[in-house]
Amino acid sequence: MIVGIGTDIIDIRRIKNTIHRYGEKFKKRCFSNNEIIRSENCFNPTNSYAKRYAAKEACSKALGTGLAKGIFWKDVEVVNDKYGKPFINLHNNALKKINKITKKDYNIEVSLSDEKNYAIANVIIFINEK
């Protein structure tokens, strides 16, 4: 059963300008150490940050809160498996929120893409029915 769907699109130039202006302060505010390491080791770090940023927004929408009501940037962590597939780990208030929504086992599916100036993320949260 689907409990939430979220989508977000962001202009990559906005992330590029923010990184240029605030640098490490912005990165450390919005991204975990794992996300920073992964993004910095990508062919195009700015695009990687933008996709992760969009995924955090999309996930917070799927949780029904947006990045408000106690959900913070680092509460949603976008990392990759050994094959490069992105997945989401919830921490702190985001984890508390999903545990309020359901006590059952859940999955979070995320899809990321970028093209020229835009990055997009789609997130679906569903309960495993067994």
What are these regions (language model features)?
Residues 1-130:
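Core catalytic alpha/beta fold that binds nucleotide/phospho-ligands
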